[in-house]
């Protein structure tokens, strides 16, 4: 699919398979989510721009590469998105964090927004929006709508699983936002869950129903 990158690294796929298993414990699911988020972060940041900086090693001065521009923003769609943040922040501890409170009404499958907090100068930053699941796409669309209202121009979306229906819906509204995912699954069921999927990521991460 155009505009979609499937991250098929063997370690990503191995960990994702264990996360899919219904017998995987809450603690195990949470640990795997942290580990896989670090691997996914490598891929979604692969083409960040570098600039040269004059530094001094214990032996001599050199020109060495360093990230250019303002700090990245990781924008978590609450609550499940927070599960991806920990591993990503271990890799990029200087990143700024945005929280976007959007939940899916289980009757209408439409997003309901209840919270938004973001750093300043979004128009000068790369914003990586994170949510484990791209199902209908409605929540991620609403979150990115809000970020664009606040000036964000350079946005990427990172998830574990995506449904074809969600990808089409998402890119129908935000064709300029590339999607990075570990898997494109088969379809959505009548309740809007990704099949075969891994269940409700938030519930499995926090041990709730």
Swiss-Prot record:
Enzyme class: transferase
Annotated uracil binding sites: 194, 199-201
Keywords for the protein's UniProt record, in alphabetical order: Allosteric enzyme, Glycosyltransferase, GTP-binding, Magnesium, Nucleotide-binding, Transferase
Cofactor: Mg(2+)
Ways its activity is controlled: Allosterically activated by GTP.
Tree of life domain: Bacteria
A GO biological process held by the record: UMP salvage
Gene3D superfamilies in alphabetical order: 3.40.50.2020
Co-factor: note: Binds 1 Mg(2+) ion per subunit. The magnesium is bound as Mg-PRPP.
Catalytic activity line of the entry: UMP + diphosphate = 5-phospho-alpha-D-ribose 1-diphosphate + uracil
GO molecular function: GTP binding; magnesium ion binding; uracil phosphoribosyltransferase activity
Amino acids binding 5-phospho-alpha-D-ribose 1-diphosphate: 79, 104, 131-139, 200
Protein EC: 2.4.2.9
Pathway: Pyrimidine metabolism; UMP biosynthesis via salvage pathway; UMP from uracil: step 1/1
Function: Catalyzes the conversion of uracil and 5-phospho-alpha-D-ribose 1-diphosphate (PRPP) to UMP and diphosphate.
PANTHER family linked: ADENINE PHOSPHORIBOSYLTRANSFERASE, URACIL PHOSPHORIBOSYLTRANSFERASE, CHLOROPLASTIC
Similarity comment: family membership: Belongs to the UPRTase family.
The protein's name in its UniProt record: Uracil phosphoribosyltransferase
Taxonomic lineage of the native organism: Bacteria, Pseudomonadati, Pseudomonadota, Alphaproteobacteria, Hyphomicrobiales
């Amino acid at each position: 699919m155009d505009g979609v990158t499937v991250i098929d690294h063997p370690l990503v796929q191995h960990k994702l398979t264990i996360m899919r298993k219904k017998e995987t414990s809450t603690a195990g699911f949470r640990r795997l989510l942290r580990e896989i988020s670090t691997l996914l972060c490598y891929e979604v940041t692969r083409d960040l721009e570098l600039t040269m900086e004059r530094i001094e090693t214990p032996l001599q001065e050199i020109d060495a590469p360093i990230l250019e521009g303002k700090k990245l923003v990781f924008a978590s769609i609450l609550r499940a998105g927070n599960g991806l943040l920990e591993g990503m922040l271990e890799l990029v501890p200087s990143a700024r964090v945005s929280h976007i409170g959007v939940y899916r009404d289980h009757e209408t499958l439409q997003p309901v927004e209840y919270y938004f907090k973001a750093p300043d100068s979004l128009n000068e930053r790369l914003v990586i929006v994170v949510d484990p699941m791209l199902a209908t796409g409605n929540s991620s669309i609403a979150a990115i709508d809000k970020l664009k209202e606040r000036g964000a121009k350079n946005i990427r979306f990172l998830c574990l699983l995506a449904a074809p229906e969600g990808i089409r819906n998402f890119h129908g509204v935000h064709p300029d936002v590339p999607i990075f995912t570990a898997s494109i699954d088969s379809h959505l069921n009548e309740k809007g869950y990704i099949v075969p999927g891994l269940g409700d990521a938030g519930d499995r991460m926090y041990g709730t129903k």
